[in-house]
Regions:
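Extracellular/periplasmic catalytic domains that process cell-envelope and extracellular macromolecules
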Residues: 125-128, 147
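Bacterial Sec-dependent N-terminal signal peptides
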Residues: 1-28, 33-34
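Short, cysteine-centered beta-strand-loop-beta hairpins and adjacent loop/turn segments enriched
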Residues: 139-149
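A solvent-exposed, acidic/Ser-Thr-rich amphipathic alpha-helical stretch
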Residues: 70-121, 128-130
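A short hydrophobic beta-strand element
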Residues: 127-138
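A mature extracytoplasmic/lumenal domain signature
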Residues: 76, 86, 136-138, 154, ...
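Short, low-complexity N-terminal intrinsically disordered segments enriched in polar/charged residues
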Residues: 22-66, 70, 74
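Short beta-strand edge/turn micro-motifs at domain boundaries
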Residues: 149-177
Length: 177
């Protein structure tokens, strides 16, 4: 009888441990990699994001270099907008296309990704948002063959795998190497 009770108790403990381990893994948050201020000014942790989100940005930038404006538009969220380094707000894929076409016509811009950091942050409503912090070197060649470079930092908000929002900061007039 003692063996039956011991076996039953052992089985119960093993099952309880498995259930607890499975439950623990489901609720575990990814590592904290930094902090950020929410729109409401509250300091919130930044969590490591999904590495698979890097592919979205790589494809998006490749579409820029390929001048594939249809692909760019298809990768944008319905409510897409970007705030440029000069404060100009570009709202919608149509406005983005017009901006890009003019920029490319003037300077034959190409983009080279330097780095991408996927991260997640909780917004003021308690919902997790997916972001990419990115750095790109842009090379521009004007109609006279003069080359200049700009380094762009772009914070990108993703919404269901699409580009929803971007904030651009830049260092301009870098000497081409």
């Amino acid at each position: 009888m003692r063996h039956i009770i011991f076996a039953a108790l052992s089985a119960f403990l093993v099952i309880a441990s498995i259930v607890q381990a499975g439950h623990h893994e489901e609720t575990e948050k990814p590592p904290v990699i930094g902090m950020g201020l929410s729109a409401g000014g509250e300091s919130k942790p930044l969590y490591a994001g999904a590495l698979s989100n890097m592919k979205i940005w790589e494809e998006y930038i490749q579409a820029h270099n390929d001048r594939d404006f249809e692909k760019i538009a298809s990768m944008n969220a319905e409510d897409f907008s970007v705030v440029m380094a000069d404060g100009q707000r570009v709202v919608g894929s149509k406005a983005q296309r017009e901006t890009l076409e003019g920029w490319i016509r003037e300077s034959n811009t190409t983009w080279e990704i330097q780095w991408i950091i996927p991260n997640n942050a909780e917004n003021d409503d308690g919902e997790m948002e997916e972001w990419l912090a990115t750095g790109q070197m842009l090379t521009m060649t004007d109609s006279e063959g003069n080359t200049s470079m700009e380094y762009h930092l772009v914070d990108v908000k993703l919404d269901e795998g699409k580009i929803a929002l971007g904030y651009v900061a830049s260092m301009e007039n870098l000497t081409a190497q």
